[in-house]
């Protein structure tokens, strides 16, 4: 928490804070008025007034932890900290009133808005500082704003877990995601993006000229479930059911067992097996109107998808560092964890966001406070 000092420094300022251009460097003391402060320990300080001998501008210099506002920086930090921990605005005001520092809900909300805006600006400045990130993880989530669903993108450094950006997107379509991926790739200079298996991210990665690792946790369990469903469908086929030319029930069982082994091993060299299976079932006819898809057609679709996405699924095995170690995560858990900590954990206790400004600022504030540990964390936000 910020420290509140009761003693004002007698050291003259080094520049004149006048809005008009002034290059004065000499000042004289112009009184030492008392200022009432709302704080848990300090209730009043003396501010030092200075007069610029060049332009005559008179200004005040406050002790550490005190500004022009009635609240001390420590009290502002406490109100923000209580809210981030999960307390409502009303609960924050009740807690501070019990400490002898009553604040209104509007004042607490204003403290949140100020610190959230500064935290968001610091995250954006860090992202635009030409930082180098090799693997960028990104994922979308949905929250409610005044009853309307909003798309929020969480972008994270896959290696360190550091939040790069939390932003609100207008939509989750291909055009929006592609432009976003291109912008992030340009700002970070990344080589790889880590995401789920949505086609929008695949298009965005190709447009940005970067590699993509598809989260295996999004693909492997669903594919294994699909393999078992197709196996049950093949097992329950009636004897009189015709089979496509060149295919048989025994062959389907062998191919399903091979697919299960390929999915569990996830070896890059299995690409040619998938291409062979894809060619084997490429002539399987689709279902007629009103009919269910046959197991042969479902195998055709599954092998086609796997053969196309296999390089993206196994990039973590093929793409290694100079020392031979893997540095690309196989799953996008880093994004899921960041979404839970920065967005969802505090959002669960709310009835939705009331404005887009709050939606942009509060997750950024949570991410900044979670990552920037230490006593100077709040001081850097409140002093900005």
Sequence positions of predicted segments:
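Short, charged amphipathic recognition helices of the HTH superfamily
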Residues: 85-96
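RNase H-like nuclease fold core
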Residues: 51, 98-204, 211
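Conserved beta-strand -> loop -> alpha-helix junction used to position metal-binding or nucleic-acid-contacting
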Residues: 195-240
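Basic, short loop/linker segments at the boundary and entry of helix-turn-helix/winged-helix-like folds
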Residues: 26-84
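Short cysteine-rich clusters marking metal-coordination/redox-active sites
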Residues: 16-20, 52-55
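Acidic/histidine-rich catalytic cores and adjacent linkers
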Residues: 195-198, 202, 242-384
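Short, flexible, mixed-charge glycine/proline-rich loop motifs
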Residues: 2-15, 40-46
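Cys/His-rich metal-chelating microdomains
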Residues: 19-25, 58, 95
């Amino acid at each position: 928490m910020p420290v509140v000092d009761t003693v004002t420094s007698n050291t003259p300022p080094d520049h004149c804070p006048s809005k008009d251009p002034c290059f004065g460097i000499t000042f004289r003391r112009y009184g030492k008025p008392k200022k009432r402060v709302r704080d848990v320990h300090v209730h009043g300080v003396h501010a030092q007034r200075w007069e610029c001998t060049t332009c005559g501008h008179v200004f005040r210099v406050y002790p550490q932890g005190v500004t022009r506002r009635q609240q001390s920086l420590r009290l502002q930090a406490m109100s923000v900290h209580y809210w981030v921990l999960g307390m409502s605005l009303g609960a924050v005001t009740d807690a501070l009133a019990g400490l002898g520092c009553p604040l209104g809900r509007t004042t607490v909300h204003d403290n949140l808005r100020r610190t959230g805006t500064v935290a968001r600006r610091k995250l954006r400045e860090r992202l635009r500082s030409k930082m180098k990130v090799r693997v960028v993880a990104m994922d979308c989530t949905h929250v409610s704003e005044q009853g309307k669903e909003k798309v929020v993108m969480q972008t994270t450094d896959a290696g360190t877990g550091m939040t790069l950006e939390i932003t609100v997107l207008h939509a989750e379509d291909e055009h929006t995601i592609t432009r976003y991926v291109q912008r992030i790739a340009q700002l970070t200079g990344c080589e790889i993006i880590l995401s789920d298996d949505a086609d929008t991210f695949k298009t965005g990665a190709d447009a940005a000229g970067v590699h993509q690792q598809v989260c295996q946790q999004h693909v492997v369990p669903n594919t294994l479930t699909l393999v078992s469903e197709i196996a049950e469908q093949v097992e329950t086929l009636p004897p009189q059911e015709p089979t496509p030319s060149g295919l048989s029930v025994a062959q389907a069982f062998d191919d399903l067992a091979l697919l299960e082994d390929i999915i569990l091993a996830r070896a890059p060299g299995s690409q040619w097996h998938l291409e062979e299976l894809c060619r084997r079932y490429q002539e399987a006819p689709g279902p007629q109107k009103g009919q269910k898809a046959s197991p042969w057609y479902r195998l055709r679709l599954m092998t086609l998808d796997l053969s196309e996405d296999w390089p993206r699924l196994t990039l973590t095995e093929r793409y290694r560092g100079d020392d031979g170690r893997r540095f690309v995560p196989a799953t996008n858990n880093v994004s899921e964890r960041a979404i839970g900590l920065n967005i969802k954990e505090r959002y669960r206790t709310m009835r939705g966001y009331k404005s887009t400004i709050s939606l942009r600022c509060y997750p950024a504030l949570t991410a900044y406070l979670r990552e920037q540990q230490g006593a100077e964390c709040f001081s850097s936000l409140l002093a900005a």
